[in-house]
Design a protein with these regions (language model features):
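Class II aminoacyl-tRNA synthetase catalytic cores and aaRS-like
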Residues: 1-587
């Protein structure tokens, strides 16, 4: 028999009235009403109201004990009668305390637990163990556990096998800075913490395993963002042998539709398949490679219509080789001039020369360019953009991609301001056909645009005969509600193709052999075609929890400066430790 409790704090119901029970938990709140002391007791499972009568030992102990102290309460379950609290699962009952034992007394709290008091992030992270007691954050972490358990169950049901890959490995050029671990036995040499288990999961396919998955920790020395935690993160790492891109898509669609339907009951979830959007389409129609499909405002190229006009700056832009692209916003015909001037200022902040507007009403067409365009052009624009009375067509003239990117940012701003996003919905899509290479803006060098291990479309022939910037890769992202959940690819499993791809990106054969020698050697002994993907656990949970910041779904995250305020990391090493590792700190 458990000496601390007979029931949890979320367990008792009306059917338990009259029972003698024992509960243990944290003192959540205390209220003195007419001499009667009411205490809410909290544990992992819920809250139960406890009452202590004046003059009793229980009353004295509760009265002398601070909020958030841990206590064990013995007492009798009573009915609340007509005073039921319908907001609590245990709201039909209360426990009349006959004995209270303090298991651990709390000091004065540096932050409130029972109330969301908007404590500074520094305080929350320094006292994360208190922060994690708060209901919302506590539930987020429990949801994260359900996400991982649900993923594991479904992956096994689909025939995948779970593996564990090394944490200490070698450094590789995968796009972010490595965390390095100095070797004690080999002076001057370092291990690296894996940015991802990329090489190991491909080696498992070469080893004859068929379907791999792992809830994998990944380590990248990169700056924080709202949707990216510095230091480390977890991903569902997946790899499949003898698969095509479509088969990877099918497995992930099955996983996500089922998982989100279970963990977000009542929500609208895209399915059973997800729309497929090429990278080029995404940039042209949404102005980014992470389209949010919960609202419209798709970008259209209206250059052909504007080209029919004369003597205006829009036509001048087209004549100089630029494009005019547009979005249509409904129900904004009555917005003030300031509303539109703010939109133009936003576009200018993001690199536009200006924002051209046409505002359609029942009787006229207003806006900054209405006098520059004839009635036929305005009517054609209205038809192309599916505008109606109260709609506004917003146009940017610039280089094709730049115009789309500016409008892409504008559509996000409008969705925020006008509350355009579909509620309680998870709208998934695939973005595929990414470019294999891109130009580095600073150096002008050709570099990999995404995953260097991807198979180029067209294989070795494309690498030998095409302009590298025109080559597409078998790369794909899964996006939900404008958030990239994962990147994936069909892998390059042929050494000759890998050498050529890295050569184009500026890597000598000797560098490839040094950095990826283990994988290259393996590929010379028979490697199956393989592909995979790696959705982020943190971002999946963030979506399901409806959180805007990824730190709200991680137990012990680093702060924006990559510091662990609770454990005081990073910390200085001792002279003894440095000596053992053959290191010296140089000022």
């Amino acid at each position: 028999m458990n000496i601390y409790r007979t029931h949890t704090c979320g367990e008792l119901r009306g059917s338990d009235v009259g029972k003698e029970v024992k509960l243990s938990g944290w003192i959540h709140r205390k209220r003195d009403l007419g001499g009667m002391l009411f205490v809410t007791l909290r544990d992992n499972y819920g809250i139960t109201q406890v009452l202590a009568n004046p003059g009793t030992d229980a009353y004295k102990v509760f009265n002398d004990t601070r909020i958030e102290s841990v206590v064990t309460v013995e007492g009798k379950v009573l009915s609340r009668g007509e005073n039921i609290n319908k907001d609590m699962p245990t709201g039909e009952i209360e426990v009349e305390a006959t004995s209270v034992i303090v298991q651990s007394a709390a000091d004065v709290l540096p932050m409130q637990v029972a109330d969301d008091d908007n404590a500074p992030e520094e305080t929350r992270l320094t006292y994360r163990f208190l922060d994690l007691r708060r209901e919302k954050l506590h539930n987020n972490i429990l949801l994260r556990s359900k996400v991982i358990a649900g993923i594991r169950k479904r992956m096994i049901e689909m025939g995948f096998t779970e593996f564990q890959t090394p944490i200490l490995t070698s450094s590789s050029p995968e796009g972010a800075r490595d965390y390095l671990v100095p070797s004690r036995l080999y002076p001057g040499k370092f291990y690296a913490l894996p940015q991802a288990p990329q090489q190991f999961k491909q080696l498992l396919m070469v080893s004859g395993f068929d379907k791999y998955f792992q809830i994998a920790p990944c380590f990248r020395d990169e700056d924080a963002r709202a949707d990216r935690s510095p230091g480390e993160f977890y991903q569902l790492d997946v790899e499949m042998s003898f698969c095509t891109q479509d088969e990877v898509f099918e497995a992930m669609e099955k996983l996500f539709v089922s998982l989100f339907t279970e963990l977000a009951p009542g929500a609208k979830v895209t399915g059973p398949t997800f729309p497929r959007i090429s990278y080029e389409q995404a940039m042209n129609r949404w102005g980014c490679d992470k389209p949010d499909l919960r609202y419209g405002l798709e970008i259209e190229d209206v250059s052909d219509i504007i080209a029919k006009t004369e003597g205006n700056f829009l036509k001048g832009a087209i004549d100089s080789g630029k494009a005019v692209r547009a979005i249509c916003v409904n129900n904004v015909g009555d917005k003030s001039r300031k509303f539109y001037s703010n939109l133009e200022a936003f576009c200018k902040e993001n690199g536009a020369a200006g924002l051209a507007t046409l505002i359609y009403t029942d009787t006229e067409v207003k806006g900054t360019v209405t006098k520059l365009l004839n009635d036929e052009v305005k009517a054609e624009l209205k038809e192309r953009m599916k505008a109606q009375s109260g709609s506004a067509i917003l146009m940017v003239a610039d280089e094709k991609l730049k115009a789309s990117v500016i409008l892409g940012k504008l559509r996000i701003k409008l969705a925020d301001e006008l509350d355009l996003r579909e509620k309680n919905a998870f709208r998934f899509c695939w973005v595929n056909d990414f470019p294999m290479f891109e130009k580095d803006e600073e150096t002008g060098q050709t570099i990999f645009s995404h995953n260097p291990f991807s198979m180029p479309q067209g294989g070795l022939d494309a690498l030998l005969n095409q302009d590298p910037l025109t080559i597409k890769a078998y790369q794909y992202d899964i996006v939900c509600n404008g958030i990239e959940l994962s990147s994936g690819a069909i892998r390059n499993h042929k050494p000759e193709i890998m050498y050529k791809a890295f050569e184009i990106a500026g890597y000598d054969k000797s560098v490839v052999d040094e950095k990826f020698g283990g994988m290259i050697r393996a590929f010379r002994f028979g490697a199956p075609p393989n592909g995979g993907i790696a959705p982020g656990i943190d971002r999946i949970t963030m979506l399901l929890a409806n959180e805007q910041n990824i730190r709200e779904v991680i137990c012990f995250p680093l702060n924006q400066k990559a510091q662990d305020l609770l454990m005081q990391a990073p910390a200085e090493a001792t002279e003894k430790q440095l000596k053992e590792l053959h290191l010296k700190i140089v000022e």
